[in-house]
Amino acid sequence: MPRPKDLVKGWLGPVTYLLAVLATGQITGDSLLRALVVLAAVELLVYPARYQWNDVRGFVADQHHPASHQRGRLPGPIDKARARVAASGAAAVAKLLVTALLIVLLPGLNLFAPLAFAVSGIFGVAVVYEVLRSTSTGKSDAIPERVRPGVLALWLVVGGGYVVRGMLGVALAVDLTTRPAVAIAAAIALWCYGIAFVTSRWSIEALAFATVLDGRLTWKAGAGQAREHLLTLVRWLPPGTCGSKVDEWAPLRGRTPFGAPWNSAIIAAGAAAALTGRLLSGACPVRQGIIIALLGGVAAVALVWTARREITLLAMGSVIIGAMAMASAPRPVAAALPWLLLMSAYLFFTTRTIRKLDRGSPVGAWAGQLGERVGRLALGTATWQAVRSRGPRSAERQQWAISQPPN
């Protein structure tokens, strides 16, 4: 199963498929069935296999994370590394074999092309990510670290996975071989959105290494924890406005610098998303496309700059819809939806706190409750309680992060 905290990412493929269908006004039963099978295979088989590989590579560093018991990663202790890694690796391979088996068992759905794209894209991005992570982290305990080229490259690469997820949805609804402009605009929008989402989340996760001293944040992390890609981001966080409880602070709720990766990326995503919506709705002259893209970017700037983001989103969304109507888009509201959804997502992830990330989404909570019931039934209450035994509580995790010496 996917990680509960990552379930929100799984909506990207279905949402982009639905957006493309709404914008084009075209759908068939075969298209819907094919999309359901492909997207389910990607989220339930391919991505979990990729995350297991990530957990295997980060096994040792994860054991030293202050929230290791609550992160849902490969469990320790370190002296069980061989057994844990072998079991996780075998499970990952099995999931990929089941994915290949679907292609053979369901030939009428023509699954080879989308699933081959998914596997090659997901693991291609993963290889680059893991190489960059291993060569760019674990070198320094300075906080905030200066923006090194390797860390910057890591921030850029993380958007690639969102391109794979999102473009799968678009490609299952639209023949992108005949509409290359749609493919390019959508890929840029998804890539930039992925960068914004991940870097904003990493900046919040970095607060696990912080404590409050005299109303200001102080940081402590060892180089061996390999978290430079998180901790470099803290340079763009407000310095001392979190009160006394770090885990309840939403540092991105107010204004943060335009140069922060999540802000720069969401502005670019806004421009590309507005253009994508217009292109999906029908033929678009080049000049009109440039104007729509500029309008989407300016509207995103307004959203980043203001402290009253909900009202600004409604106002700018109305402007985008009006512009689509003036541009004679056949379905102006549907054409504006890519921009509206990306900006709504920005509003959501800028309100996150450590506590909210730990709590996860309602869908994740429901999935966790279902898994708990199944686990208790399969293992018995006593064994299940032993398996689910918790580590240190939040306050203890904060103290751990402060007191541990650098590795």
Spans of features found by a protein language model:
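Interhelical loop segments of eukaryotic multi-pass membrane proteins
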Residues: F59-Q70, F209-R216
